[in-house]
Regions:
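Flexible "arm" and connector segments at domain edges
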Residues: 1-64, 68-103
Length: 103
């Protein structure tokens, strides 16, 4: 399954819950999705709090999936082709230099 198919699947899920409806309690606005994305990303940090290794890979995978799904939905509602944006960003990153020494 590719990014577009995953996005379509996510949109079907959101539609089935009524979250695209006008009076929903979970409006799929860029603001709300950005907040949700950030909150889910923060949950990933919990897996590394006070340790360097993953102790529950299945739980981490679930949190990563949450982040990915919110990212797909945010790109969808803002009309951004996420696959294209990611490929463009990879090309930009190939030309960048990073200082690998810690300061």
């Amino acid at each position: 399954m590719d990014i577009r198919q995953l996005t379509d699947e996510m949109n079907r899920f959101v539609r089935s819950k009524g979250w695209f409806d006008e009076n929903t309690k979970r409006p799929q606005t860029p603001r709300n999705l950005s907040i949700s994305l950030s909150l889910e990303a923060a949950e990933i940090l919990e897996h590394f709090q006070w340790r360097d290794e993953v102790t529950d890979k299945e739980e981490l995978a679930s949190e990563l999936a949450d982040v990915g799904l919110y990212l797909l939905e945010l790109a969808s509602v803002t009309g951004i082709d996420l696959e294209e944006a990611m490929l463009k960003k990879l090309e930009v990153n190939k030309t960048r230099e990073w200082d690998v020494e810690k300061k």
